[in-house]
Amino acid sequence: LIATPTGLGANIYASVYGKVTEITDDRIIIEAADEQPDEFVPIDVPEDASKLDMVKAAGVVGMGGAGFPTGVKLNINLAETPMGEINPEINPELPKDFSIDCGYILINAAECEPGLEHNTQQIETQTDKVIRGIKYCMEITHAEKTIIAIKKKHHKAIKALQKALEKESAITMHLLPDIYPMGEERAVVRECLGVNLDTTQLPSAARAVVVNVETACRVAEAIDEKRPCISKNLTVRGKLNGGNAAHVYMDVPVGVSVGELIEKAGGIDGKYGEIIMGGAFTGKSTELDAPITKTTGAILVTVEFPDLHGANVGILVCA
């Protein structure tokens, strides 16, 4: 444990054994030890710690990109949470007495940004962990049901879930259309529960909590293994040697440099435009020496920018 929040935030753990050599406004620099044991240092919690306490102690955050502390998000009793006020102007088809019968965990498995594949790969290869994480989220929040929201195109992941859910009556799947931005939180609520929320409303207004699929797995690790949140799944692709195929890396230690992962994926193929950390729509330009964080979803290397002879280019409307 190398940092604790003073306000809204989450614990931060070192992903390597070593010595802190420098602290800046946005980084803690660690000189890694020559020998790196495979095992991690378990989170320090009392024997009678609740599952929510374990999630908080582990520093789990929303792994889909937003990074909101999961221990705060799950700190709700959905069984006792009333429906929020539904705006009839954006819900003209709903009856005045519309209600949602129980609390829901909505698992965001849309992996909405184009080109990303690490969420679907985790579903395919770690289905049991996904289900365990879902059940823990349900238990903590007193949710009676879960809906896994996943795009129709992810056939292999859907098949893996169908098999895993054969005996799980409280967990179902909802197939999303293959369009952007289906992974936006309120879009998931709308698609799964049929309610349009105002932009100022949280999913709790629909008696729901939205959890990214990787986040659910980190919840399972915190509870089952007392594992701190020290790694990230991500996709690397773009203008790389060997082509534009997706390179999926699971459990990458937080703090590894962008450049190191690009080299692992084959290295940059000649000249390029920029390196984007995050998705193609919502990511930000970054540098080779930048570290990945708990919220890094992808590293994309773009082609060279065309010469527009000084013309201004921008997105007028996005989503």
Regions found by a protein language model. Name each.
Residues 29-107, 114-117:
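Hydrophobic alpha-helical hairpins/lids featuring a short glycine-rich hinge
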Residues 115-125:
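Glycine-rich phosphate-binding "P-loop"
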Residues 144-258, 264-271, 279:
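Hydrophobic alpha-helical positions that pack around
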